[in-house]
């Protein structure tokens, strides 16, 4: 794999940390008001800006595997329909007929054209209105005025990003910044979908996302899963994209120590068994990437601050259908990841209940949790509030401890 040398350097960084008993760190610990998880006004601003005004990573190229493919989702109260036309180009539309706003498609599949199930108006895969049943009833209709509502979309490096309204700017290279060549080497489109699971929990979407952003909890919370293979409280942290709002975390496994006895020239693809690689793509995506499997998490706000939905889609590379990185088949690996997330979401739900009690005024992110600090500062900037304007950053006695 072309990116093997990139990750050899990452391995060497982690080995240095493991030997020294340290981790990549922020300059200091950081206190965040609990209201960022519970305040309805802040929650409404997040939905209106962070989600509606920012491009979203919605799926992989392999979810539209051939000409005529379509893929639908309705994750942010905006029903979206993706198509791949006969030239191979991806389009994004509001999943609504322009006659009377009926939904055009459900799920995913393949089709030669789009026909409205309500009154049989017909559109091509580029969103052009081509047929009106009983057209004489509409007089001299100008079909060009009834093309599907187009949404911005870009496909690159095997990923598809889209905007939830027509004015959103989508530039994959701008989103990924200097990490774009690394994602290009991963070629996430060369994958096969395995399975999907959804969680709907009584917790804030950011609380659920927090668990992807530090390894400090591995040994305590995941004793029977990740804790059995991981080196806790150690990670290599890097930022990328606009204002460094995205990040990559590499968590070493205990097995990484074996590489100290093996010459670097002999390191091969099996080094990817020695660490876990997690990417956060603003505002709500966590990607666990390896040469064998990709775990794609999308986290969405619910109807109020204390509700959220996590969508987990698991993929394997088309050339590695038999075994996952942990030696299991793809379905068994999918079920293992679901078990890990179950352990985390239980904690997120009880934390939310405690925060709603109104007596824990701050959450504290240690210096050993730089990704959490970086991500939450980005969220504040995203709603027009800089961290310097909020009562954050000074560490003292935590309320109610």
Regions found by a protein language model. Name each.
Residues 51-52, 99, 125, 213, ...:
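Residues at helix-coil transition
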Residues 9-13, 35-39, 46, 115-121, ...:
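Short low-complexity stretches enriched in small and charged residues
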Residues 33-35, 59-60, 142, 171, ...:
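Short, solvent-exposed coil/turn linker segments
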Residues 52-59, 63-64, 132-137, 279-283:
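Short Pro/Gly-enriched beta-strand edge/turn motifs at strand-loop
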Residues 63-166, 170-181:
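Rieske [2Fe-2S] iron-sulfur-binding domain
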Residues 1-96, 100-107, 152-155:
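N-terminal pre-ligand scaffold of iron-sulfur
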Residues 58-66, 142-143, 274-279, 313-315:
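Short linear motifs in intrinsically disordered
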Residues 3, 83-84, 89, 154, ...:
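C-terminal catalytic domain of Rieske-type non-heme iron oxygenases
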